[in-house]
Amino acid sequence: MKADNRNRTSVAIVGAGPNGAALANLLGLYGVDTVVVERAPQIVDFPRAVGIDDEALRLFQTAGVADELSRDIIQNVPLRMFNARGECFADVRPSVREFGWWRRNIFMQHLAERTLRDALARYPHVSLRTGEEVVGLEQDDAHVTLRVQGADGQHYALDADYVVAADGGRSPLREMLGIPLAGTTHPMKWVVVDVKNAGLDQPCTALNCDPRRPNVCIYLPFNYRRWEFLVFPHEDEQAIAQPESIRALIAPYVEDVERLEIVRARTYTHHSRVAERFVAGRIALVGDAAHLSPPWIGQGLNAGLRDVGNLAWKLAGIVHGRLNPGVLATYESERRAHAKAMIDLADTFGAMLMPTSRPVAFLRDRLLAAARFAPGLKDYVLQMRFKPMPSYTRGVVVTGASDASGAIGRMIVQPDVETADGVRRKLDDVLGPWFSIIGWQCDPQASLSDDERAFWTALGAKFVQIVRSRSGTCREQRIASAHGSECVEDVDNAMADWFDRHAGPLVVVRPDRYVAAQTDAVGIAGVTAAFRAFAPQQQAEAAHVC
């Protein structure tokens, strides 16, 4: 940046890890003046997150960085669970791509951070300041002032309309705000090791559920591999991270342990904690600053990216005067409960998969072996249907009698569609990065009054009509909108299936791809009226008199 004013910005993000950098990319896309303050002068090289799911990649698709990130990602990696005898008792390999991406993918955090930071160069209104530390803050009803120690050691004040704490599990900003991080710190520690040249042809994430020493082995990009070993209470956490100890731990799993190169090793403690508040005045917490999870279902970083996806458009809408400031509070009401649910699931999985008790491990093996003969239960596990999906009943949603289908407050699917010029595209690329209104086999503008159309246009919504594949009279004459909506074809019948399950041909889709409302031509007036509550008063009134 680019930004000429060093001391003033619309949004300040503290922390340039994957959550902070992802948020900065989205705010850059939305045209929001943004400053990112990062204490570390360089991207840190510790072993960190390696799992990224379909929801996260969908967010990066919106941000315009999914393709570049994918160059460093192994997609569609199965999860296999092995007992103490080395027998695989569960093979989790989801085959569905309902959101347009595979559910299980493996990456390395430091590579993703570099890509995300490099992508910020696209935006002259976004500034990344590394080697700078926030040492104090003050806020009032109008703005937040951060006291920042610059890379040169000098202090300066940074005024922002809003601040986001993406500064990790030890979050200094959360501490400054006095927000408790409630929950549990687990007594057991784990040594995490990244190696090269392991010579192991095991292209999966392996949970070695051996009660003698539970461990995880993860297939990483570019000939890397990660092991995570339980450290018992009587063991010294520094000694076990030494090269000779690491090789002794890995030796049972490789042919030539001397051949592998130990790249990095660190001992970690697992936490299951959630901040009591995600929003304090004009400051929001995201990622590890808001919640800490054990790694057993690979959702720690992904939960943080859900925070980012939920928060980015709300901040952008508020800053640009399209949404009222009260919408910020819905970030907490929508995200906190789901973040807690994911942590609870991770705790359950950890207790089931990594017991150190042999009788408990024996019982687990028998139960999971039996589950293979129950088709419904088997599919529930192998397709990862156990992962709780966010479902918003309050916040920026319009529920009520129209929600008989259960779609409102849930993420909409993302199939491929075909544009008027015959190009196959992912649905989100057609919807655009902001609000959209989909009409299934109807023009979404046809049932809007001039007043209602003016409101949605002022909000910035895009109108998209989806029709059945090959609905036109011939290849050269496809169905077109009479009102200027973009018209696309449902080439794989995925949207037809979705609308069969969720009645109502008109769907309001939020920028984070959650369904804000679903209705019909009669109900769209009520939905529009309800949505006016989310707009600034002057905008709602102006649209009402157009």
From Swiss-Prot:
UniProt keyword annotation of RNA-binding present: no
Membrane-spanning residues: none
GO annotation (BP), single: 3-phenylpropionate catabolic process
EC top class, as a word: oxidoreductase
One Pfam family of this chain: FAD_binding_3
GO molecular function per UniProt: 3-(3-hydroxyphenyl)propionate hydroxylase activity; FAD binding
SUPFAM superfamilies: FAD/NAD(P)-binding domain
UniProtKB keywords: Aromatic hydrocarbons catabolism, FAD, Flavoprotein, NAD, Oxidoreductase
Similarity field: Belongs to the PheA/TfdB FAD monooxygenase family.
The protein's role, per its UniProt record: Catalyzes the insertion of one atom of molecular oxygen into position 2 of the phenyl ring of 3-(3-hydroxyphenyl)propionate (3-HPP) and hydroxycinnamic acid (3HCI).
Binding site for FAD: 10-39, 278-288
Protein name as it appears in the record: 3-(3-hydroxy-phenyl)propionate/3-hydroxycinnamic acid hydroxylase 2
Cofactor(s) needed: FAD
Pathway the protein acts in: Aromatic compound metabolism; 3-phenylpropanoate degradation
EC number: 1.14.13.127
Catalytic reaction(s) noted: 3-(3-hydroxyphenyl)propanoate + NADH + O2 + H(+) = 3-(2,3-dihydroxyphenyl)propanoate + NAD(+) + H2O; (2E)-3-(3-hydroxyphenyl)prop-2-enoate + NADH + O2 + H(+) = (2E)-3-(2,3-dihydroxyphenyl)prop-2-enoate + NAD(+) + H2O
